[in-house]
Amino acid sequence: MEGLDVDDVFHHYRLCPTEVEAVTYYLPRLLSGETLHGADKLIHRVEISGCEPKDLAARYAPAPQAVSSGDRFFFTTCKSKRGSNLQSVRGAGAGTWSIQKTTEICHAGVKVGEVKNLSFKKKGKSTGWVMEEYRCLLPEATVSDGVKVFCKMHLAQHAPDAARQESEAYKLQQQQPEAVTPSTHAQKRPPPAAAADPHPPLTLPPQPTITRTICW
């Protein structure tokens, strides 16, 4: 792609990793801090545990070429419940992330990770937000309070209008006017004219010259 910088590639092409790529390429590099050649600009390193999708959607814009589906990518910690390393905390605001299924990811006949498909629900009903949560088998992915995961949050195929409006909430943040500051080069106002002296000094009229003539 002549004339196109590597870091600009993901601004023109949709970030859509396969399951194998998610756990064998992206997640290991996110854990080690290696560069992702531009894709890291689209992956937000933020703790999303306890956050509702609408709040995340208002804060982070969807990835380029994925505005209609609302794709947002996160590198985060899936926190474990207190006293358990198996069950994960799924409550988020007034709703809950419900695990729909867990699938093993294999490459060349060997398990390399797994993906959990989740749906965000309120009062038992789907809101139209879904997420794929990818986990690898690297030991460094396990931390003291949970497991480091790579997530893709997006709209379901038949998401209701309410969810689609939530996905576009980031536009309101972008449209906020910038604070207006006075120009440092603004012309200074001239100082006010000095007030007239109410008691000006008296000017005496010129004195007449007296010439004496002496007669002899």
Model-predicted segments: where are they?
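Beta-strand cores of modular interaction/reader domains in eukaryotic scaffold and signaling proteins
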Residues: 73-76, 119-121, 130-135, 149-154
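Structural scaffold elements adjacent to functional motifs in cytosolic proteins
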Residues: 1-126, 143-144
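Terminal low-complexity, poorly structured segments
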Residues: 23, 131, 198-202
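A short secondary-structure junction signal
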Residues: 85-88, 128-133, 142, 160-166
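Intrinsically disordered, low-complexity acidic/polar and Pro/Ser/Thr-rich regulatory regions
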Residues: 2-11, 139-216
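Short amphipathic alpha-helices and their capping/turn residues within compact interaction modules
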Residues: 27, 31-32, 136-139, 155
